[in-house]
């Protein structure tokens, strides 16, 4: 048996109430079908229909939301997975790699990882992330915990401020401040699936969405060997023990990635590049003709049988030939999407197979579609045109600024809950309303029951007589507020901000 054995990676056990005993191929497939049901029927997936892809608060149903984007990624992920399995079958390597009885789970894990890949994104996308992190940095100043003298620590939270002679506790304070100021959608996705939603998915399915392997509390440089894998936070301090168990169950070395995650990542890269351009045309940011010229000029030197001509040029010519029977827009994007998929999917599949030893070990330190090939150049072309002509458009930038202000404003509104003393907040949690804190009581009542219960569950397990208790209690209180606000849809966040700011509807 080769060292690559996917039976050691496609782990169908669960954290709680795990199936026991030896399972047949059909029984294992049923376990992953259960995962599919849990994911597709979860409220977090439904909320994606009102979260931003590129254009916030969009009323045009033809423009993509996070949900429609995720469904497209799911389809591309399935295509890549099938292509990989088909090629391995042709090479008679399925059995060698322990995949002969696991092709169904292999595909299902990829599909559901694709559907879930944006599940933790806050309202207004990356600008929502930036708003959360900026707001907490302005109060916790994690950089002061690294280099400044203790007397210069600007952290406004007394329990998190560094103290002389408390080095062990100071180390926890540093980790907590760093962690809270590095909210990230992928890390929040892990927290949603395990801690908040308690979906109890199989270890393999959760491994599929652990896209980045750097802890959110990481301080200092990352090793060159894992620079790509650790370029963003992948999980929080609150899920540290769960991720440690996940690594053990999936036989992952520290800071290594689950093999099927590379497929999910490639599917996302392929999907959003074309989709963002199509949505921009739908929004009349530019016409199809203008888009073609943007792409043509951005490609640079042109040759007759270049990848540009085979993909973009071919789509343009075919769409112009059918103008009498179909709209040029629809035709162009249909051909562009098909041409792009037909070139990039086989390439991504072959890259996966060619680099399988490193990918299986979880150490392949780049994306499948990130190399010096023309295929990567094509993806970069789409991305660069989107950056130059879509994301920089005044309408898009104005909406992003509004989104940033909404999230910052909501954090300002809920800030009184973070200003309460430990004892006062504990009493508020127990009694739910306190006459001496009318504003805080009303704000606390507005928090989601699911999020409040998650806070209570974890804090109740902390030893109250420990020196760490005030530090960790405040950490989980910050998580409570971040969980609530990041879980809102764009529209709900917008409406909630206007209601609480007493702005005319």
Curated annotation (Swiss-Prot):
It comes from the Bacteria. Its EC number is 3.1.5.1. GO terms for biological process: dGTP catabolic process. One of its GO terms (molecular function) is dGTPase activity. It catalyses: dGTP + H2O = 2'-deoxyguanosine + triphosphate + H(+). Residues 66-273 form the HD domain. Its cofactor is Mg(2+). dGTPase preferentially hydrolyzes dGTP over the other canonical NTPs. Homotetramer. This is Deoxyguanosinetriphosphate triphosphohydrolase. It comes from Salmonella typhi.
